[in-house]
Amino acid sequence: FDNVTGAMYRGTYVDYNHGRALEFYNNGGQLVTGSYNSNGQTYHFATEQEAASSNGKLVVGQLIANGMIKFQGNTYDMIDNQVQTGQQKIDNNWYLFDKNSGAMQTGFQNLAPYGQNKICYYNPANGQMEYGQQNINGHWYLFDKVTGARLTGWQSLAPYGQNKECFYNQDGTMHYGWLDTDRYDYYFDNVTGAEYIGGSHNIDGRWYNFDNQGHCLDFNQRVINWFESRKDHLTYSMYGSRNGSDGTADCSGSMTQAIRDAGAGPYAYLYNTDSLHGYLRANGYYLVTANGNFTPERGDVIVWGRQGESGGAAGHTLVISQGGNDAQCISTCYYTNDQPGTAVQELPYNWYWHLDGCTYYYVYRQGDQHRN
């Protein structure tokens, strides 16, 4: 009877008071002893006489068996009539048996209760741990070739016989299509799951270029890269070319030129932070918020200073180079007090905004997230 509820026990039971003896109670709640037939198979449970003559090695009703057996719909591993539990290596294959009942476990299993921080997959057909690439219920997964641990994130399939880089989601499924991160956008082939690395690729009828790290060089990235490529090359000045053509630039002149070079329409002149708003709207940007709450996203163009009051040195503009809670921004700025070659700086956005006195701001974002 159950120690808590007092309910009569039926079915299999692992007696931990006597090692790990597997016992069976029939529908009437009676302990089975002697021979017992189940699903065409005959099993033997120790009788009182056998237990008495075993010198303490058997208890009444203990299943007498060795090796793998199937009983009452479960598979057990028996050694010297004792149920084995946890991870067991049998004939060079790993199996998992429930830590309490001893029943073989199949499918996805978290091994944390068994002392290992990994998720593995045990083939339902034979209970064996699987390795490498596995198609399960129509989804591709990757399991470490040595440990069997389910892998996530970026993975090179070269050790598994394929020349491609793939990405596996948090649930272990292979990722297809766009993968948008806080810093870069990536694309994975819709059929093979291979990451697009380098070259030009047609995606949904539009051509995109990718660098040799798999970063998509879309419109937003080209704006950011305009600034990245000019680090250590520009000196801040509001009175020279303003767009870097003479080695000097200011924030709004740089932003105008960066957006134009990324593929926007021609500008009438190099705008300041007051007049830049119209150029942004005319080139696919929409206003996310004026001084309201927002989560920075890669490619956001932010203008500091109230429109109509931010001309000259009163305003600033920058682009978000990394979104999310740890947002980073890049711009041509006066942060280094006009030191030569240091005008382009990448700084933590929230820190920089507070440094500037939490000024009024406008956030603009491309309406076409994957503008090519």
Residue ranges of predicted features:
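Extracellular adhesion/carbohydrate-binding repeat motifs centered on closely spaced tryptophans
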Residues: F1-R222
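Hydrophobic beta-strand residues in large extracellular and virion-surface proteins
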Residues: Y36, Y43-F45, V223, F227, ...
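Intrinsically disordered, low-complexity
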Residues: N92, S200-Y239, Q328, N337, ...
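Residues that flank catalytic or metal-binding motifs in active/ligand-binding sites
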Residues: K118, K164, Y184, R206, ...
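N-terminal capping segments
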Residues: L217-G265, Q307, G312-H316
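...with weaker cross-activation on analogous glycine-rich loops/strands in unrelated enzymes
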Residues: A264-Q345, Y349
